[in-house]
Amino acid sequence: MSGCVLLSRGATAAAAAARASRVLREFTARRRPLHTSLQSCSFAKELFLGNIEQKGVFPFPEVSQHELSEINQFVGPLEKFFTEEVDSRKIDQEGKIPVDTLEKLKSLGLFGIQVPEEYGGLGLSNTMYARLGEIISLDASITVTLAAHQAIGLKGIILVGNEEQKAKYLPKLSSGEHIAAFCLTEPASGSDAASIQTRATLSEDKKYFILNGSKVWITNGGLANIFTVFAKTEVVDSDGSKTDKMTAFIVERDFGGITNGKPEDKLGIRGSNTCEVHFENTRVPVENVLGEVGGGFKVAMNILNSGRFSMGSAVAGMLKKLIELTAEYACTRKQFNRNLSEFGLIQEKFALMAQKAYVMESMAYLTSGMLDQPGFPDCSIEAAMVKVFSSEAAWQCVSEALQILGGSGYMKDYPYERMLRDARILLIFEGTNEILRLFIALTGLQHAGRILTSRIKELKSGNVTTVMETIGRKLRDSLGRTVDLGLTGDLGVVHPSLGDSANKLEENVHYFGRTVETLLLRFGKNIVEEQLVLKRVANILINLYGMTAVLSRASRSIRIGLRNHDHEVLLANMFCVEAYFQNLFSLSQLDKNAPENLDEQIKKVSRQILEKRAYICAHPLDRAS
């Protein structure tokens, strides 16, 4: 189990599962929509312009007391089921989830969490999905299996499927009778999704697409009955020319010509089914095109963008359990006649873990609150930031926990080494963090570029008025102008106890906006090639979003008198101070010719290494002659 000693099984666990299932069904039958404030869903993009869009962010999104009590009624039984019934150590050792465990997950409705109720699912909001993710995260293999099924496997049908497709496929997918998989990655195309080679050719009678190709590292690949498959198709453009474009398909295993390899032997998430899937002359009815022919790339990106936010709540759930277990050890383990918990370097690690959990949790639920607004708001940047922050924090925090535990953390008798192995994949799947950083930065810069186009053109052409205005702004900034973006003061939305942190956020946002304009002026369209610059832009933005999330959440906690809100204030202020100074350093590195910027040295070192494909320094014991 994920950090838990196995308790009694059999009747007790079955009863827990039955209670959780009953409460969940009753809850979904009588619940009402989430009540959150409306928002313009442009928060992250507005940061690139030096603005803080308060609408939908302040105050922190919340659910009603009635909804909260109903959620908590089934959270308890569900947590009890995962604690008593799921043997994570066995799943890890045997490399598979037992059939009876999968069946109980189906009976709990966990295969249809976000499938609309009219198709047999629970129809839960993004916020409630995030809340469930905290509990499900007690076992990483189950988390990945369920996420691959519904966050990406069937998500395309919900997002862009027509009514016939939804009615045909969603009921059996939501019940778990059928399991879904998402087939995009290929041997020669990982992060470069557009370079896939799998091809779908229209049959002569134009009734089928003939699908041929192979996909790799497909979660649920050996279990799935239904696949969302992406393939190249020939598309005739308006001018009559033919081009290859990606198309998405709903593919049934029963269509034939589908085989899969044996499950991969993985470092972590070992209980999830990961394998190659091969398609050989698989006949897919034209009715099973998902979206439009040639529109598959957009479908794939929308699917991936829609689910990333939930990693924040899932990792936070795992970290909370890890903190609990590690704290018990630190408070009872004695060294030098003192408990480990009394030593400053150990205390620092607990503060770090708590801070990271608080920030990612705040970011995740702020994003889910945005996503729950009507009209499918675009929160793709926010969701990507949650994924990057939470995945890297997970790896860092589990490593720190093992350091506290010493040798015990390295032993397979305990769950900690498994947690470390399970955490590593988080930085890779659902978009590598490197690719997501580029996505975060470029999407925001593209937005800013559209807004600032005329101004940048005037600066490049030497328009006197615009140039003088820019010089004046830089002069005022250099003199230490006071930045007021409306977070503090009599009409401020941040609680006074967080005022200094709010001022730091405002200052960072202001100078970030100025820096964005400078970067667009300096690099223009060529900025897409400046990956080290884009990485810093993304890192700053992630910090700004984290600062915003904790300030909004902590202010709400103070306002409504939540227990331990003073602890939240400590965590929020700690993070904001650290993020503020990190941002200042990153902003200074983005200055042209800044001494802090080592990009050219980095490129030169890597170029020399890669030319030789080796470490090229002489051995320290070598002599010149």
Curated annotation (Swiss-Prot):
UniProt keywords, alphabetically: Acetylation, FAD, Flavoprotein, Membrane, Mitochondrion, Mitochondrion inner membrane, Oxidoreductase, Phosphoprotein, Transit peptide
Modified residues (Phosphothreonine): 482
Catalytic activity from the UniProt record: eicosanoyl-CoA + oxidized [electron-transfer flavoprotein] + H(+) = (2E)-eicosenoyl-CoA + reduced [electron-transfer flavoprotein]; octadecanoyl-CoA + oxidized [electron-transfer flavoprotein] + H(+) = (2E)-octadecenoyl-CoA + reduced [electron-transfer flavoprotein]; oxidized [electron-transfer flavoprotein] + hexadecanoyl-CoA + H(+) = (2E)-hexadecenoyl-CoA + reduced [electron-transfer flavoprotein]; decanoyl-CoA + oxidized [electron-transfer flavoprotein] + H(+) = (2E)-decenoyl-CoA + reduced [electron-transfer flavoprotein]
NADP as UniProt keyword: no
Active site: 430 (proton acceptor)
Transit peptide per record: 1-41
Alphabetized InterPro entries for the sequence: ACAD9/ACADV-like_C (IPR049448), Acyl-CoA_DH_CS (IPR006089), Acyl-CoA_Oxase/DH_mid-dom (IPR006091), Acyl-CoA_Oxase/DH_mid-dom_sf (IPR046373), AcylCo_DH-like_C (IPR036250), AcylCo_DH/oxidase_C (IPR009075), AcylCoA_DH/ox_N (IPR013786), AcylCoA_DH/ox_N_sf (IPR037069)
Glycoprotein in keyword set: no
Top-level taxon of the source organism: Eukaryota
Compartmental location: Mitochondrion inner membrane
E.C. no: 1.3.8.-
Modified residues annotated as N6-acetyllysine in this record: 45, 525
GO cellular component: dendrite; mitochondrial inner membrane; mitochondrion; nucleus
PTM sites of type N6-succinyllysine: 96, 242, 525
Cofactor: FAD
Subunit composition and interactions: Homodimer. Interacts with NDUFAF1 and ECSIT. Part of the mitochondrial complex I assembly/MCIA complex that comprises at least the core subunits TMEM126B, NDUFAF1, ECSIT and ACAD9 and complement subunits such as COA1 and TMEM186. Interacts with TMEM70 and TMEM242.
Protein name: Complex I assembly factor ACAD9, mitochondrial
Gene that this polypeptide is encoded by: Acad9
